[in-house]
Amino acid sequence: MSVVLDTPVAVRRTAMDLLARREHGRVELTRKLRQRGATDELIELALDRLAEEGLLSEARYLESFIRYRSNAGYGPARIREELGQRGLNRGDVDQALRDCGVNWAERLQDAWQRKYAGQRPHDPRSRAQQTRFLAYRGFPMDMIGRLLSGRDLDDY
């Protein structure tokens, strides 16, 4: 049985249920509430109140998402793109990526180690394959080049 979202209380309760499961951004929460049949007016009212009460926080959502995706082996470019697709402000995303405290060189090393077991490329074809994989994961090309050529990543 689905809940009818025609009152501010029902919209707020549904939003809080969604937030209890995990952090959400405002755009994502708006989309989910709209899919459940809530009006834009009721959604705005509920989300404004949740934000005032500190229950809805873009900063917390960014931090949580960056931590989750970086732990899954993704780099800053991929995470930035995913957050952009979710409707978050590019400036806020860039600031959150700078402030997150993730050691991207370590994450790159971990992703490479998991996929290739530390085997450096032995020919141009395998180098291109490893480079494509790591670039697709969202790591910067200069870091990938340093890793694959065996140079130190401590500068990052």
Swiss-Prot record:
Q: Name one GO cellular component term.
A: cytoplasm
Q: Which residues cross the membrane?
A: none
Family from the record: Belongs to the RecX family.
The record's annotation in HAMAP family points to: RecX
According to its UniProt entry, the function of this protein is described as: Modulates RecA activity.
Per the UniProt entry, what is one GO biological process?
Answer: regulation of DNA repair
Its source organism is: Pseudomonas putida (strain W619)
Record-linked PANTHER family: REGULATORY PROTEIN RECX FAMILY PROTEIN (PTHR33602:SF1)
- Write the record's keywords in alphabetical order, separated by commas: Cytoplasm
Keyword Acetylation in annotation = no
Q: What is this protein called?
A: Regulatory protein RecX
Tell me which InterPro entries the record gives: RecX_HTH_1st, RecX_HTH_2nd, RecX_HTH_3rd, Regulatory_RecX, WH-like_DNA-bd_sf
**Is Cytoplasm one of the keywords?**
yes
**What subcellular locations does the record give?**
Cytoplasm
